[in-house]
Amino acid sequence: MAKEALIVKTTPLPQSRISFELEIPSETCKTCVNETISTISRSAKIPGFRLGKIPKQVLIQRIGITQLHASALEKIIDKSWQEALKIKSIEPLSEPELVDGFESLLAKFSPEKSLKFTLQTDVAPELKLKKSKGLSVEISKTKFDPKSVDEALEKSRSQFANIIPVTNRAAKLGDIAVVSFKGKYKDSGKEIDGGTSESMDLELEKNKMIPGFVEGIVKMKIGDTKTLNLKFPEDYSHEDSRGKEAIFEVSLKDLKEKELPELNDDFAKQSGNKESLKELKKDIEKQLKENFEKTQKDIKIEALLDALTNELVAEIPKSMIDIEVRNNIEQTAQRFAQQGLDVKSTFTPELVKSLSESTRPQAEKNVQRNLALKALAEKENITVEKDEIDLKMKDYEDAISQSSKQIDIKKLTEVISKDLLKEKLIIWLEENSEVKEKTTKASQASKTTKAKKTTTKTTKATKTATKTTKATKTQNKKEKK
Protein backbone atom coordinates (compact mmCIF):
# COMPACT_ATOMS: atom_id res chain seq x y z
CA MET A 1 0.00 0.00 0.00
CA ALA A 2 1.46 3.38 -1.07
CA LYS A 3 2.28 5.92 1.60
CA GLU A 4 -0.20 8.80 1.76
CA ALA A 5 1.23 12.16 0.73
CA LEU A 6 0.97 15.56 2.32
CA ILE A 7 -1.82 17.63 0.75
CA VAL A 8 -0.97 21.31 0.24
CA LYS A 9 -3.30 24.06 -0.97
CA THR A 10 -2.13 27.68 -1.20
CA THR A 11 -4.24 30.84 -1.34
CA PRO A 12 -2.83 34.34 -1.95
CA LEU A 13 -3.81 36.97 0.64
CA PRO A 14 -3.58 40.79 0.73
CA GLN A 15 -0.30 42.52 1.69
CA SER A 16 1.79 39.83 -0.04
CA ARG A 17 0.79 37.07 2.36
CA ILE A 18 0.00 33.50 1.42
CA SER A 19 -2.08 30.86 3.17
CA PHE A 20 -1.03 27.19 3.30
CA GLU A 21 -3.84 24.73 4.01
CA LEU A 22 -2.13 21.48 4.98
CA GLU A 23 -3.58 18.00 5.48
CA ILE A 24 -1.29 15.54 7.26
CA PRO A 25 -2.05 11.82 6.74
CA SER A 26 -2.87 9.80 9.87
CA GLU A 27 0.07 7.51 9.11
CA THR A 28 2.46 10.47 9.37
CA CYS A 29 0.86 11.59 12.65
CA LYS A 30 1.16 8.11 14.16
CA THR A 31 4.79 7.73 13.03
CA CYS A 32 5.76 11.10 14.47
CA VAL A 33 4.17 10.29 17.86
CA ASN A 34 6.01 6.95 18.01
CA GLU A 35 9.31 8.65 17.08
CA THR A 36 8.75 11.22 19.82
CA ILE A 37 8.11 8.51 22.41
CA SER A 38 11.23 6.66 21.26
CA THR A 39 13.36 9.82 21.47
CA ILE A 40 12.15 10.69 24.97
CA SER A 41 12.58 7.06 26.09
CA ARG A 42 16.30 7.14 25.26
CA SER A 43 16.97 9.98 27.70
CA ALA A 44 14.19 9.62 30.31
CA LYS A 45 15.14 8.27 33.75
CA ILE A 46 12.48 6.33 35.65
CA PRO A 47 13.39 4.28 38.75
CA GLY A 48 13.22 0.52 38.12
CA PHE A 49 13.87 0.76 34.38
CA ARG A 50 17.07 0.79 32.38
CA LEU A 51 17.82 3.78 30.16
CA GLY A 52 16.09 3.30 26.80
CA LYS A 53 14.11 0.27 28.02
CA ILE A 54 11.06 2.03 29.46
CA PRO A 55 7.77 0.50 28.24
CA LYS A 56 5.61 2.80 26.12
CA GLN A 57 2.64 2.82 28.51
CA VAL A 58 4.86 3.56 31.53
CA LEU A 59 6.43 6.50 29.70
CA ILE A 60 3.03 7.85 28.65
CA GLN A 61 1.79 7.58 32.23
CA ARG A 62 4.88 9.36 33.59
CA ILE A 63 5.24 12.12 30.94
CA GLY A 64 1.56 12.56 30.16
CA ILE A 65 -0.15 12.00 26.82
CA THR A 66 -0.77 15.75 26.30
CA GLN A 67 2.91 16.60 26.66
CA LEU A 68 3.90 13.79 24.29
CA HIS A 69 1.33 14.91 21.73
CA ALA A 70 2.53 18.52 22.04
CA SER A 71 6.13 17.50 21.31
CA ALA A 72 5.01 15.37 18.36
CA LEU A 73 2.77 18.14 17.01
CA GLU A 74 5.64 20.64 16.99
CA LYS A 75 7.66 18.24 14.83
CA ILE A 76 4.69 17.59 12.53
CA ILE A 77 4.13 21.30 11.95
CA ASP A 78 7.82 21.99 11.30
CA LYS A 79 8.37 19.03 8.96
CA SER A 80 5.17 19.58 6.99
CA TRP A 81 5.94 23.30 6.67
CA GLN A 82 9.39 22.62 5.20
CA GLU A 83 7.94 19.99 2.85
CA ALA A 84 5.13 22.32 1.74
CA LEU A 85 7.63 25.05 0.84
CA LYS A 86 9.55 22.58 -1.35
CA ILE A 87 6.38 21.30 -3.02
CA LYS A 88 5.21 24.81 -3.91
CA SER A 89 8.73 26.26 -4.47
CA ILE A 90 7.99 29.24 -2.23
CA GLU A 91 10.53 31.25 -0.22
CA PRO A 92 8.90 32.80 2.87
CA LEU A 93 9.91 36.18 4.29
CA SER A 94 8.60 35.50 7.78
CA GLU A 95 8.06 32.67 10.23
CA PRO A 96 4.76 30.82 9.65
CA GLU A 97 1.75 31.83 11.72
CA LEU A 98 -0.57 29.04 12.87
CA VAL A 99 -4.02 30.48 12.19
CA ASP A 100 -6.04 28.55 14.80
CA GLY A 101 -3.31 28.59 17.45
CA PHE A 102 -1.26 25.72 18.85
CA GLU A 103 -3.48 24.96 21.86
CA SER A 104 -6.59 24.65 19.69
CA LEU A 105 -4.81 22.31 17.29
CA LEU A 106 -3.41 20.22 20.15
CA ALA A 107 -6.90 19.76 21.62
CA LYS A 108 -8.18 18.06 18.47
CA PHE A 109 -4.97 16.17 17.62
CA SER A 110 -5.19 12.37 17.41
CA PRO A 111 -2.49 10.07 15.97
CA GLU A 112 -5.24 7.87 14.51
CA LYS A 113 -6.71 10.65 12.35
CA SER A 114 -5.46 12.93 9.60
CA LEU A 115 -4.68 16.47 10.73
CA LYS A 116 -5.68 19.71 9.00
CA PHE A 117 -4.32 23.16 9.82
CA THR A 118 -3.54 26.47 8.13
CA LEU A 119 -0.29 28.42 8.17
CA GLN A 120 0.25 31.94 6.85
CA THR A 121 3.46 33.74 5.92
CA ASP A 122 4.74 36.80 4.06
CA VAL A 123 6.26 36.41 0.61
CA ALA A 124 8.08 38.74 -1.76
CA PRO A 125 5.58 41.15 -3.34
CA GLU A 126 4.75 41.26 -7.03
CA LEU A 127 6.31 44.38 -8.51
CA LYS A 128 5.05 46.68 -11.25
CA LEU A 129 6.20 50.08 -12.47
CA LYS A 130 3.52 52.28 -13.99
CA LYS A 131 6.27 54.15 -15.79
CA SER A 132 10.07 53.93 -16.01
CA LYS A 133 11.16 56.08 -18.96
CA GLY A 134 10.54 59.81 -19.24
CA LEU A 135 10.37 60.60 -15.53
CA SER A 136 10.56 64.34 -14.85
CA VAL A 137 11.99 65.97 -11.71
CA GLU A 138 12.85 69.52 -10.69
CA ILE A 139 15.72 70.34 -8.36
CA SER A 140 17.15 73.56 -6.99
CA LYS A 141 20.49 74.36 -8.58
CA THR A 142 22.53 76.22 -5.99
CA LYS A 143 25.81 77.93 -6.76
CA PHE A 144 28.99 77.37 -4.81
CA ASP A 145 29.44 80.16 -2.26
CA PRO A 146 33.07 81.36 -1.90
CA LYS A 147 32.20 82.59 1.60
CA SER A 148 32.09 78.96 2.69
CA VAL A 149 35.90 78.92 2.57
CA ASP A 150 36.07 81.66 5.20
CA GLU A 151 33.44 79.84 7.28
CA ALA A 152 35.56 76.67 7.16
CA LEU A 153 38.65 78.61 8.21
CA GLU A 154 36.79 80.06 11.19
CA LYS A 155 35.69 76.58 12.26
CA SER A 156 39.29 75.43 12.00
CA ARG A 157 40.43 78.39 14.12
CA SER A 158 37.89 77.41 16.75
CA GLN A 159 39.21 73.83 16.80
CA PHE A 160 42.79 75.03 17.36
CA ALA A 161 41.87 77.71 19.89
CA ASN A 162 43.45 77.94 23.33
CA ILE A 163 40.94 77.53 26.16
CA ILE A 164 41.44 80.13 28.89
CA PRO A 165 39.48 80.73 32.12
CA VAL A 166 37.05 83.66 32.47
CA THR A 167 36.47 85.25 35.89
CA ASN A 168 35.63 88.92 35.38
CA ARG A 169 32.46 88.89 33.28
CA ALA A 170 29.17 87.15 32.55
CA ALA A 171 28.70 84.31 30.07
CA LYS A 172 28.19 85.15 26.42
CA LEU A 173 27.65 83.25 23.18
CA GLY A 174 30.83 81.47 22.08
CA ASP A 175 31.97 80.71 25.64
CA ILE A 176 32.36 77.26 27.16
CA ALA A 177 30.20 77.04 30.27
CA VAL A 178 30.67 74.37 32.91
CA VAL A 179 27.16 73.81 34.25
CA SER A 180 25.19 71.53 36.51
CA PHE A 181 21.47 71.15 35.92
CA LYS A 182 18.43 69.18 36.93
CA GLY A 183 15.27 69.00 34.85
CA LYS A 184 11.71 67.93 35.57
CA TYR A 185 8.41 68.03 33.73
CA LYS A 186 6.25 71.00 34.67
CA ASP A 187 2.93 69.13 34.72
CA SER A 188 3.94 66.03 36.73
CA GLY A 189 7.10 67.14 38.52
CA LYS A 190 8.74 63.92 37.35
CA GLU A 191 12.49 64.06 36.72
CA ILE A 192 13.45 64.02 33.05
CA ASP A 193 15.34 60.92 31.98
CA GLY A 194 18.83 62.11 31.02
CA GLY A 195 17.96 65.64 32.10
CA THR A 196 20.41 65.83 35.01
CA SER A 197 24.15 66.47 35.13
CA GLU A 198 26.53 67.39 37.95
CA SER A 199 29.12 68.87 35.59
CA MET A 200 28.97 69.33 31.83
CA ASP A 201 31.04 71.43 29.43
CA LEU A 202 28.60 73.23 27.15
CA GLU A 203 29.61 75.43 24.22
CA LEU A 204 27.22 78.37 24.24
CA GLU A 205 26.04 78.20 20.67
CA LYS A 206 22.52 78.58 19.35
CA ASN A 207 20.65 75.36 18.52
CA LYS A 208 22.57 73.41 21.18
CA MET A 209 20.36 71.70 23.75
CA ILE A 210 16.61 72.47 23.62
CA PRO A 211 15.42 75.98 22.64
CA GLY A 212 16.12 78.56 25.35
CA PHE A 213 18.63 76.51 27.34
CA VAL A 214 21.77 78.20 25.99
CA GLU A 215 20.08 81.60 25.88
CA GLY A 216 19.18 81.17 29.55
CA ILE A 217 22.82 80.69 30.54
CA VAL A 218 24.00 83.79 28.66
CA LYS A 219 24.58 86.71 31.11
CA MET A 220 24.92 84.34 34.09
CA LYS A 221 28.04 84.71 36.25
CA ILE A 222 30.07 81.98 37.94
CA GLY A 223 28.18 80.83 41.03
CA ASP A 224 24.78 81.96 39.72
CA THR A 225 21.79 79.60 39.79
CA LYS A 226 18.83 80.14 37.51
CA THR A 227 15.44 78.53 36.85
CA LEU A 228 14.62 78.04 33.16
CA ASN A 229 11.05 77.41 32.00
CA LEU A 230 11.39 75.69 28.64
CA LYS A 231 9.46 73.53 26.22
CA PHE A 232 10.67 70.47 24.32
CA PRO A 233 10.25 70.69 20.51
CA GLU A 234 7.45 68.69 18.90
CA ASP A 235 10.05 66.74 16.89
CA TYR A 236 12.33 65.99 19.86
CA SER A 237 14.19 62.68 19.60
CA HIS A 238 12.65 61.23 22.76
CA GLU A 239 8.96 60.74 22.10
CA ASP A 240 7.96 60.97 25.79
CA SER A 241 9.28 64.54 25.99
CA ARG A 242 7.87 65.95 22.76
CA GLY A 243 5.96 69.19 23.24
CA LYS A 244 6.15 69.02 27.03
CA GLU A 245 6.98 71.98 29.27
CA ALA A 246 9.97 71.55 31.57
CA ILE A 247 11.71 73.33 34.44
CA PHE A 248 15.51 73.27 34.67
CA GLU A 249 17.56 74.42 37.67
CA VAL A 250 20.90 75.48 36.19
CA SER A 251 24.09 76.52 38.01
CA LEU A 252 27.13 78.05 36.31
CA LYS A 253 30.16 76.41 37.95
CA ASP A 254 32.92 77.71 35.70
CA LEU A 255 33.42 79.70 32.51
CA LYS A 256 36.01 79.52 29.74
CA GLU A 257 36.57 81.23 26.42
CA LYS A 258 38.40 80.41 23.23
CA GLU A 259 41.50 82.38 22.28
CA LEU A 260 41.57 82.06 18.50
CA PRO A 261 44.90 81.78 16.64
CA GLU A 262 45.81 84.35 14.00
CA LEU A 263 45.15 83.49 10.38
CA ASN A 264 48.67 83.36 8.99
CA ASP A 265 51.20 80.95 7.52
CA ASP A 266 51.97 79.50 10.96
CA PHE A 267 48.31 78.59 11.36
CA ALA A 268 48.33 76.96 7.91
CA LYS A 269 51.25 74.75 8.97
CA GLN A 270 49.60 73.87 12.28
CA SER A 271 46.08 73.14 11.05
CA GLY A 272 46.51 71.82 7.52
CA ASN A 273 50.18 70.99 7.12
CA LYS A 274 50.43 73.62 4.38
CA GLU A 275 53.31 76.03 3.76
CA SER A 276 51.16 79.15 3.51
CA LEU A 277 47.70 80.47 4.31
CA LYS A 278 47.09 80.94 0.59
CA GLU A 279 47.84 77.26 -0.04
CA LEU A 280 45.56 76.24 2.85
CA LYS A 281 42.68 78.33 1.47
CA LYS A 282 43.18 76.81 -1.97
CA ASP A 283 43.10 73.29 -0.54
CA ILE A 284 39.96 74.00 1.52
CA GLU A 285 38.23 75.52 -1.52
CA LYS A 286 39.06 72.44 -3.61
CA GLN A 287 37.63 70.08 -0.98
CA LEU A 288 34.50 72.19 -0.50
CA LYS A 289 33.87 72.35 -4.25
CA GLU A 290 34.25 68.57 -4.57
CA ASN A 291 31.82 68.05 -1.68
CA PHE A 292 29.46 70.61 -3.19
CA GLU A 293 29.42 68.87 -6.58
CA LYS A 294 28.85 65.50 -4.93
CA THR A 295 25.99 66.96 -2.90
CA GLN A 296 24.39 68.38 -6.05
CA LYS A 297 24.65 64.98 -7.74
CA ASP A 298 23.20 63.25 -4.67
CA ILE A 299 20.25 65.67 -4.65
CA LYS A 300 19.53 64.83 -8.29
CA ILE A 301 19.76 61.08 -7.64
CA GLU A 302 17.47 61.38 -4.61
CA ALA A 303 14.88 63.19 -6.71
CA LEU A 304 15.04 60.54 -9.44
CA LEU A 305 14.72 57.70 -6.92
CA ASP A 306 11.72 59.40 -5.32
CA ALA A 307 10.11 59.78 -8.75
CA LEU A 308 10.76 56.13 -9.58
CA THR A 309 9.38 54.98 -6.23
CA ASN A 310 6.18 56.93 -6.89
CA GLU A 311 5.66 54.74 -9.97
CA LEU A 312 5.91 51.49 -7.98
CA VAL A 313 2.83 49.36 -7.49
CA ALA A 314 3.39 46.71 -4.80
CA GLU A 315 1.81 45.37 -1.63
CA ILE A 316 4.77 45.49 0.73
CA PRO A 317 4.47 43.05 3.67
CA LYS A 318 5.10 44.28 7.20
CA SER A 319 7.90 41.75 7.70
CA MET A 320 10.05 43.42 5.02
CA ILE A 321 9.90 46.70 6.95
CA ASP A 322 10.58 44.86 10.23
CA ILE A 323 13.70 43.24 8.75
CA GLU A 324 14.99 46.61 7.50
CA VAL A 325 14.39 48.21 10.91
CA ARG A 326 16.23 45.36 12.64
CA ASN A 327 19.14 45.59 10.20
CA ASN A 328 19.44 49.36 10.78
CA ILE A 329 19.59 48.90 14.56
CA GLU A 330 22.15 46.08 14.26
CA GLN A 331 24.35 48.22 11.99
CA THR A 332 24.14 51.09 14.47
CA ALA A 333 25.14 48.74 17.29
CA GLN A 334 28.08 47.44 15.24
CA ARG A 335 29.34 50.99 14.64
CA PHE A 336 29.15 51.69 18.37
CA ALA A 337 31.02 48.46 19.13
CA GLN A 338 33.76 49.39 16.62
CA GLN A 339 34.20 52.65 18.53
CA GLY A 340 34.84 50.65 21.69
CA LEU A 341 31.51 51.46 23.33
CA ASP A 342 29.59 49.05 25.54
CA VAL A 343 26.67 48.09 23.31
CA LYS A 344 24.85 46.08 25.99
CA SER A 345 24.65 48.98 28.43
CA THR A 346 23.92 51.57 25.74
CA PHE A 347 21.25 49.66 23.82
CA THR A 348 18.68 49.28 26.56
CA PRO A 349 15.22 47.85 25.75
CA GLU A 350 13.83 51.39 25.97
CA LEU A 351 16.39 52.71 23.48
CA VAL A 352 15.84 49.80 21.07
CA LYS A 353 12.09 50.49 21.18
CA SER A 354 12.71 54.18 20.53
CA LEU A 355 15.06 53.33 17.66
CA SER A 356 12.51 50.94 16.17
CA GLU A 357 9.86 53.66 16.14
CA SER A 358 12.07 56.48 14.89
CA THR A 359 13.79 54.47 12.14
CA ARG A 360 10.62 52.90 10.76
CA PRO A 361 9.66 55.70 8.30
CA GLN A 362 13.16 55.69 6.79
CA ALA A 363 13.20 51.88 6.72
CA GLU A 364 9.91 51.88 4.83
CA LYS A 365 11.33 54.38 2.34
CA ASN A 366 14.47 52.25 1.87
CA VAL A 367 12.43 49.12 1.18
CA GLN A 368 10.21 50.95 -1.33
CA ARG A 369 13.25 52.31 -3.15
CA ASN A 370 15.01 48.95 -3.28
CA LEU A 371 11.88 47.30 -4.67
CA ALA A 372 11.44 50.08 -7.23
CA LEU A 373 15.03 49.56 -8.41
CA LYS A 374 14.47 45.81 -8.54
CA ALA A 375 11.35 46.35 -10.64
CA LEU A 376 13.32 48.66 -12.96
CA ALA A 377 16.05 46.04 -13.42
CA GLU A 378 13.45 43.42 -14.32
CA LYS A 379 11.46 45.69 -16.64
CA GLU A 380 14.46 47.04 -18.57
CA ASN A 381 16.50 43.82 -18.32
CA ILE A 382 19.45 45.54 -16.64
CA THR A 383 21.97 43.04 -15.24
CA VAL A 384 25.57 42.76 -14.03
CA GLU A 385 27.91 40.42 -15.89
CA LYS A 386 30.43 38.13 -14.19
CA ASP A 387 33.42 39.88 -15.79
CA GLU A 388 32.22 43.20 -14.32
CA ILE A 389 32.15 41.65 -10.84
CA ASP A 390 35.58 40.05 -11.34
CA LEU A 391 37.04 43.39 -12.43
CA LYS A 392 35.63 45.14 -9.36
CA MET A 393 36.90 42.35 -7.10
CA LYS A 394 40.47 43.28 -8.08
CA ASP A 395 40.03 46.54 -6.14
CA TYR A 396 39.68 44.46 -2.97
CA GLU A 397 42.58 42.03 -3.55
CA ASP A 398 45.08 43.95 -1.41
CA ALA A 399 42.58 44.45 1.41
CA ILE A 400 41.67 40.75 1.35
CA SER A 401 45.30 39.59 1.40
CA GLN A 402 46.27 41.99 4.21
CA SER A 403 43.20 41.40 6.38
CA SER A 404 43.74 39.41 9.57
CA LYS A 405 40.09 38.34 9.51
CA GLN A 406 38.54 35.68 7.32
CA ILE A 407 36.74 37.38 4.41
CA ASP A 408 33.49 35.83 3.19
CA ILE A 409 34.18 35.98 -0.55
CA LYS A 410 30.66 34.86 -1.46
CA LYS A 411 29.10 37.62 0.63
CA LEU A 412 31.56 40.20 -0.72
CA THR A 413 30.69 39.14 -4.27
CA GLU A 414 26.99 39.60 -3.54
CA VAL A 415 27.59 43.09 -2.12
CA ILE A 416 29.70 44.08 -5.14
CA SER A 417 27.05 42.73 -7.51
CA LYS A 418 24.31 44.75 -5.77
CA ASP A 419 26.42 47.93 -5.79
CA LEU A 420 27.27 47.58 -9.47
CA LEU A 421 23.64 46.94 -10.36
CA LYS A 422 22.52 50.02 -8.42
CA GLU A 423 25.14 52.13 -10.22
CA LYS A 424 23.86 50.87 -13.58
CA LEU A 425 20.24 51.54 -12.65
CA ILE A 426 20.99 55.10 -11.52
CA ILE A 427 22.94 55.81 -14.72
CA TRP A 428 20.00 54.44 -16.71
CA LEU A 429 17.61 56.71 -14.78
CA GLU A 430 19.79 59.76 -15.45
CA GLU A 431 19.93 58.95 -19.17
CA ASN A 432 16.20 58.26 -19.51
CA SER A 433 14.73 61.01 -17.30
CA GLU A 434 14.32 64.76 -17.53
CA VAL A 435 15.95 66.86 -14.79
CA LYS A 436 14.95 70.52 -14.64
CA GLU A 437 17.18 72.85 -12.64
CA LYS A 438 15.98 75.94 -10.83
CA THR A 439 18.83 78.28 -9.84
CA THR A 440 18.73 79.70 -6.32
CA LYS A 441 21.19 81.56 -4.14
CA ALA A 442 22.07 80.01 -0.81
CA SER A 443 24.97 79.99 1.57
CA GLN A 444 27.20 76.93 1.66
CA ALA A 445 26.01 76.28 5.20
CA SER A 446 22.36 76.07 4.16
CA LYS A 447 23.27 73.90 1.18
CA THR A 448 25.15 71.52 3.41
CA THR A 449 22.19 71.35 5.78
CA LYS A 450 19.82 70.63 2.90
CA ALA A 451 22.12 68.01 1.49
CA LYS A 452 22.36 66.28 4.83
CA LYS A 453 18.59 66.20 5.16
CA THR A 454 18.31 64.81 1.66
CA THR A 455 21.18 62.38 1.35
CA THR A 456 22.42 61.33 4.75
CA LYS A 457 21.88 57.75 5.88
CA THR A 458 22.16 58.75 9.51
CA THR A 459 18.67 58.44 10.97
CA LYS A 460 17.05 60.04 13.97
CA ALA A 461 17.60 56.70 15.65
CA THR A 462 21.38 57.01 15.31
CA LYS A 463 21.22 60.57 16.65
CA THR A 464 19.22 59.29 19.62
CA ALA A 465 21.75 56.54 20.24
CA THR A 466 24.63 59.03 19.94
CA LYS A 467 23.02 61.34 22.48
CA THR A 468 22.56 58.40 24.82
CA THR A 469 26.23 57.49 24.43
CA LYS A 470 27.32 61.05 25.17
CA ALA A 471 25.16 60.99 28.27
CA THR A 472 26.77 57.70 29.28
CA LYS A 473 30.26 59.20 28.81
CA THR A 474 29.31 62.22 30.90
CA GLN A 475 28.00 59.98 33.65
CA ASN A 476 31.17 57.90 33.58
CA LYS A 477 33.27 61.06 33.97
CA LYS A 478 31.19 62.08 36.96
CA GLU A 479 31.61 58.69 38.56
CA LYS A 480 35.40 58.85 38.08
CA LYS A 481 35.47 62.26 39.74
UniProtKB/Swiss-Prot annotation:
UniProt keyword Cell division, yes or no: yes
Domain notes: Consists of 3 domains; the N-terminus binds the ribosome, the middle domain has PPIase activity, while the C-terminus has intrinsic chaperone activity on its own.
Name of the protein: Trigger factor
PROSITE patterns (alphabetical): FKBP_PPIASE
InterPro entries on file: PPIase_dom_sf, PPIase_FKBP_dom, Trig_fac, Trigger_fac_C, Trigger_fac_C_sf, Trigger_fac_ribosome-bd_bac, Trigger_fac_ribosome-bd_sf, Trigger_fact/SurA_dom_sf
Catalytic reaction list: [protein]-peptidylproline (omega=180) = [protein]-peptidylproline (omega=0)
GO molecular-function terms, A-Z: peptidyl-prolyl cis-trans isomerase activity; protein folding chaperone; ribosome binding
Region (Disordered): 435-481
